[in-house]
Amino acid sequence: MDNNEQNYEDFISTVSHELRTPLTSIRGFSQTMLSSWDKLDDENKKKFIKIIEQQSNRLINLIENMLAVTKLQSTNNSFIYNEIDIKPVVEQIIAIVKNQYQDQKFELNFSQNLSKVFVDKDKFQQILTNLIENSAKYSPDGGTTKIKAYTAGEQVILEVSNLGINIEEKDYEKIFTKFARIDNPLTRKVQGSGLGLYITKSLTEKMGGKISVKSVPINETESEITFTLEMPIRSIEEQARIKCNQ
């Protein structure tokens, strides 16, 4: 068996395990409600329905990430490049994420002369959504996600930071790998597929960018976690060449 076949089998095995957990919860709570509807009070009914909703959302997220991974591995995965402004894209994402994480705050800091980026808009939006949603998900209650964007030389830099539990330097690369989960008290409580950052890194690199993470302790219990996205500023000639090849 070659590496590709082994990687595919490992992927299917892990995905099957990840899918089984929410499906088991949905089936279990559905069966309980069907068999004991008259015995359950309104509070428990609402509680069970809420759990079913949460696990359904988790299942949808898993399936979307699995499809994204499959597309990444396909040689036919196409990119449609255009020059876009970052700010309206970020503002649109925040409006969506705020609806899911209503106790979280968001601070934006964009330089006045921020250059445009030459990217596939849908895939770039997926990158930013993963980073901003990830920050909100792993922030403490009432936490703040800070988003900063500026031009540095021939790069557009976008930083997404929040306060959270420290990520050790030895785990910096690990968190961008498939199905990676860093073991700490917060990640044990937060459900995730372990695919989001892998997809984010893969899409970033396919569009010529780079992504990194840094964790700086600020006290005994919290660190400032910053994900830095670097996207190249393309000249007119580079844009034309990329357009011809898409």
Where does each model-flagged region fall?
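Primarily the dimerization/phosphotransfer
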Residues: 1-33
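Short alpha-helical segment of the dimerization/phosphotransfer core of two-component systems
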Residues: 54-59
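Helix-loop junction within the histidine kinase core
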Residues: 70-81
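Conserved catalytic submotifs in the C-terminal HATPase_c
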Residues: 80-84, 105-115
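Short conserved segment of the HATPase_c
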Residues: 167-179
